[in-house]
Amino acid sequence: EFTISFSSPVISTGQHIDVGDEDYHDGDDDVDYTDDVDDVDDSHGSPSQLLQGGYQRNQHYGGGNYQSGYYRPNKQHGNGYGGQYPKKYGSGHKY
């Protein structure tokens, strides 16, 4: 019957959202939710996808909500807004 482990809290999204070692660095490495969104949508995903990925991914940043993932402008393919936010915003998970 059910073989899904409850240790995989994001399995229901159908997106590839790891919570492995690459995910809790500084949030600025190239393996983060933006790549997972790109797996689903060759553009940059809808804001809802980004919010979903950011929220779930940042559960283990220590209490950050979806903003932790959503405002991460210093990515080369970014959050779907073409990097219009200045780099000074830095890594979103510091919110």
Curated annotation (Swiss-Prot):
Q: Where is this region: Disordered?
A: 1-95
Superkingdom in the source lineage: Eukaryota
User: Where is there biased composition of kind Polar residues?
Assistant: 1-15, 45-59
- InterPro entries to which the protein is assigned, alphabetical: Miracidia_Ag_8I
Acidic residues: compositionally biased ranges: 20-41
Q: Which residues cross the membrane?
A: none
Give the family per the record: Belongs to the immunogenic miracidial antigen family.
What's the protein called, per UniProt? Immunogenic miracidial antigen 8C
Species of origin:
Schistosoma japonicum
Gene name of the encoded protein: 8C
